[in-house]
């Protein structure tokens, strides 16, 4: 009985070392979650009070479902309108 337990423990250890720890679902890896800079949104739209709504409307005109004002690629970047096919985190 102890030999079986040792064998199972060895098998689990081997699987963790070779395969790594299970990571669950990866977020933001889908091409549908990729955020693309809007081509039609006028500059300064995101600075307005209803900037996210204007951005979403511009993205809808570009055949996207979601649009949001973001600081990309860095937090220090200028606020711009980005579009994506799906709403992703």
Swiss-Prot record:
GO terms for biological process: defense response to fungus; killing of cells of another organism. Residues 1-26 form the signal peptide. It comes from the Eukaryota. Disulfide bonds join 33-88, 46-69, 55-81, 59-83. Keywords: Antimicrobial, Disulfide bond, Fungicide, Plant defense, Secreted, Signal. Its main location: secreted. The lineage of its organism: Eukaryota, Viridiplantae, Streptophyta, Embryophyta, Tracheophyta. This is Putative defensin-like protein 40. Belongs to the DEFL family. The keyword DNA repair does not apply. The keyword Chloroplast does not apply. It is found in: Secreted. One of its GO terms (cellular component) is extracellular region.
């Amino acid at each position: 009985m102890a030999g079986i337990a040792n064998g199972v423990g060895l098998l689990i250890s081997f699987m963790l070392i070779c395969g790594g720890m299970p990571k669950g679902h990866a977020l933001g890896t889908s091409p549908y979650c990729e955020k693309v800079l809007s081509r039609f949104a006028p500059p300064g739209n995101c600075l307005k009070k209803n900037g996210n709504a204007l951005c979403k409307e511009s993205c809808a005109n570009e055949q996207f479902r979601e649009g949001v004002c973001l600081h990309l690629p860095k937090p220090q970047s200028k606020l711009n309108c980005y579009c994506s096919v799906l709403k992703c985190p």
